[in-house]
Design a protein with these regions (language model features):
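ABC family nucleotide-binding domain
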Residues: 6-10, 14-207
């Protein structure tokens, strides 16, 4: 059996905000099919590393590559890389004026030019996967925090990414809603999804 291939590689990455250096000469890699959990104190650069991978927070020096291609400001390359790397944030960032279904289908239709019927079919499969198929025509304000975060996961999966980044996905949730989101993440991990997770949920991290 061949060893997992490094899909994302960080090499001597540095990032500062003013005089505060958040990422200091970080070198690491994340392999296909693996789940990596990043833990540490607040302000230690965990979320910044995730955002640097997606170029949401450009790094100052060093290199980050995704599938061998450097992460830079080249628009065409960056769009392709962002399609391959899905991200789920602390806040759900759903569009309040769009239904759950339209939130999930928006990016495939706009970016991948997927036909509406095909995008809707794919979205319903994903909503079923996260247990929300019966809520497809509701709006975000009609859902609980846990349900909104599960929609956010389905939305990220709709782009058919090769890697999923989770930036403290349960930190903004009430305690009783945390488990439903972690259950979806466990299901993704069991399915072989490559995942990089920043979390304070130590029980999930130990798994």
């Amino acid at each position: 059996m061949s060893a997992p291939q490094a899909f994302i590689v960080a090499d001597h990455v540095c990032k500062s905000f003013g005089t505060h250096q958040v990422l200091r000469d970080v070198s690491t890699h994340f392999s296909t099919g693996e789940v990596t959990v990043i833990i540490g104190a607040s302000g230690s650069g965990k979320s910044t590393l995730l955002r640097a991978i997606n170029r949401l927070e450009p790094h100052d020096s060093g290199t980050i590559t995704i599938d061998g291609v450097p992460v830079t400001d080249d628009a065409a390359t960056l769009q392709k890389q962002r399609c391959e790397v899905g991200m789920v944030f602390q806040q759900f960032n759903l569009f309040g004026h769009l239904s759950v279904l339209d939130n999930v289908t928006l990016a495939p239709r706009r970016v991948r030019r997927t036909a509406r019927a095909q995008a809707n079919e794919q979205a319903m499969l994903l909503l079923r996967r996260v247990g929300l198929q019966d809520h497809a025509h509701k709006y975000p304000w009609q859902l609980s925090g846990g349900q909104q975060q599960r929609v956010a996961i389905a939305r990220a999966l709709a782009m058919q990414p090769k890697v999923m980044l989770f930036d403290e996905p349960t930190s903004a949730l009430d305690p009783e809603m945390v488990q439903e989101v972690l259950d979806v993440m466990r299901e993704l991990a069991r399915g072989g999804m490559t995942m990089i997770v920043v979390t304070h949920e130590m029980g999930f991290a130990r798994e």
